[in-house]
From Swiss-Prot:
Keywords: Cell inner membrane, Cell membrane, Membrane, Transmembrane, Transmembrane helix
Name of protein: UPF0060 membrane protein M446_5886
NCBIfam families registered for this protein in UniProt: PRK02237.1
Record-linked InterPro entries: UPF0060 (IPR003844)
Superkingdom: Bacteria
GO annotations of cellular component type: plasma membrane
Ranges annotated as spanning the membrane: 4-24, 31-51, 59-79, 85-105
Pfam families: UPF0060
Membrane topology summary: Multi-pass membrane protein
Length: 107
């Protein structure tokens, strides 16, 4: 599995898991949402172990930008709220930072 695919799938799993808990606590949904939510969060953690990185902290840091961008896609697709220019600019900055962490020369 490529690093980018692992990050994308991890973001989807993390956001889905966190949203399940949000739905239970904030939207008054059934506690039955917690089962799939916790399973998604476990899948998220497993997927992050599949990225090509010698250090966990670097893998997590690079993932952060992907998470921000994916969260804004979730905002639009699942919650029906279109990200504004500030959201998009912030996501672009985060993705640029992730690229530096992920692709920067090591020595």
């Amino acid at each position: 599995m490529t690093t980018l695919l692992a990050y994308a799938l991890a973001a989807l799993a993390e956001i889905a898991g966190c949203f399940a808990i949000w739905a239970w606590l904030r939207l008054g949904r059934s506690p039955l949402w917690l089962g799939p939510g916790l399973a998604s969060l476990i899948l998220f953690a497993v997927l992050l172990t599949r990225v090509e990185s010698a250090a966990a902290g670097r893998a997590y840091a690079a993932y952060g930008g992907v998470y921000v961008a994916a969260s804004l896609l979730w905002l639009w697709a699942a919650e029906g709220q279109r990200p504004d220019r500030w959201d998009l600019g912030g996501a672009a900055l985060c993705l640029a930072g992730s690229a530096v962490v992920l692709l920067g020369p090591r020595g």
